[in-house]
Amino acid sequence: MEEAPLRDLRDLAWFERNLDAGISALHLDDERLIAGDWDGGLHCWDLDGEIQWNIKASNRVSGFAVGGGWLYAVCGRDVVSIELSSGQICWEHELEGSSDLVACTPEGDTILATSSVFDLEMNDFIESTIWRFNSEGELLHQDSIDERPWAISMRKDGVAFLPLSRPRCGMIRATPDELHHTPLPTSSPATCGTIAQSHTVVGHVDGTLTCIDDGMVMDDDTYTNQPGTIESIAATEPGFLVSTVIEQGAVGAGFGGAEGLARSYDEKGKLLWQIETELGRNIEHVMYGPVVNEQASAWFTSWDKRKSIVEVREAIQGMPLFRSESDSRVTSIEGNREYLALGLEDGTLYLIESDLLSRRLSSIEEQKDESHRSDLAEKLRRLRS
């Protein structure tokens, strides 16, 4: 497959903003874009780029959940409730250790947050706590476990599901009153998870993909196991994207091996296409993005500790659309069929919009065609002379 043409994201972006600290979390919906940064700043814009509000939390923002009229954020050691329209902080609660994940019901009346304690001598997480609050900030329940959850999804009734790392691995089912541990088909630790169109997909260290629907583990052949540790998953479109970290010479790595491998599958689990990166370059994020050429785009970001590459292809056909390079690492990405937001370690934020992206890419292609025709005409003139 041909290499994607190199483009500057600034030339393709709907708008660009520059924060004073690296971007650590993003939320994107039909009305707004919210960015959290490493210094605890939270910034909200409408989709035309007009600032709506700015507030300051205690420390690095690691995640968001939106329900009803509230934004819930995990920041440093705290979980914070923010009025979505004004940015006013309604309440905040200090957790034990560092805050990690947050989820809420669609109405925002039940909130679940997780925090973990990291042991420097053991170089591992030794304890996590799962916290349940109501919309007023009242702590309803808390439980501690020996594992760290790596993803969280919550049903409308407030029951949540959290895939775990070692020692038990498996999954926690968190009800309003207690926690229930459930083994998964693999005993491998979870690494990531994503909420798909109607279910949750969990990635594991051994390359397994587990599909969970309403708390039930589905025997679904759609989610093909991968040849290495799952790094990132996207499943908001029919089908899914997945990136893995694989060792040199592993099956599926191609000749000589590849540090990063990303694949696109259709809704039946058929492999559509894949991309590989050279040794030392890891594909850290995959995401479906704005429609181009009447199909969703597929976005991949990779990093080799020196240069970040964003590569964009047609989700179904795999045709390269463009790639962009930067000295700053992509740290967060959120997308849908209309917009895609990219946050970088140096504080740069881009919002990409479907129609503008399509027009800019078409304009570039037309310029290339015109240049090609001019070159041909010049050659013909030389032949005639």
Where are each of the predicted segments found?
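Residue-level signature of beta-propeller blades and closely related beta-rich strand-turn architectures
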Residues: 39, 77, 116-118, 165-166, ...
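Beta-strand-rich domains and repeat architectures in extracellular enzymes and scaffolds
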Residues: 13-43, 56-62
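Repeated scaffold domains used in trafficking and secretory/extracellular systems
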Residues: 21-27, 59-68, 96-107, 145-156, ...
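Short loop/turn segments that connect beta-strands within beta-propeller blades
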Residues: 46-49, 83-87, 133-138, 174-177, ...
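WD40 beta-propeller blade core
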Residues: 43, 80-81, 131, 169-172, ...
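Short, solvent-exposed loop/turn segments at conserved positions within beta-propeller repeat blades
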Residues: 74, 120-127, 164-167, 249-259, ...
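Blade-level signature of beta-propeller repeat domains, shared across WD40, Kelch, NHL, RCC1
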Residues: 326-385
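A short helix->beta-strand "capping" segment at the edge of beta-propeller domains
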Residues: 1-21, 48-50
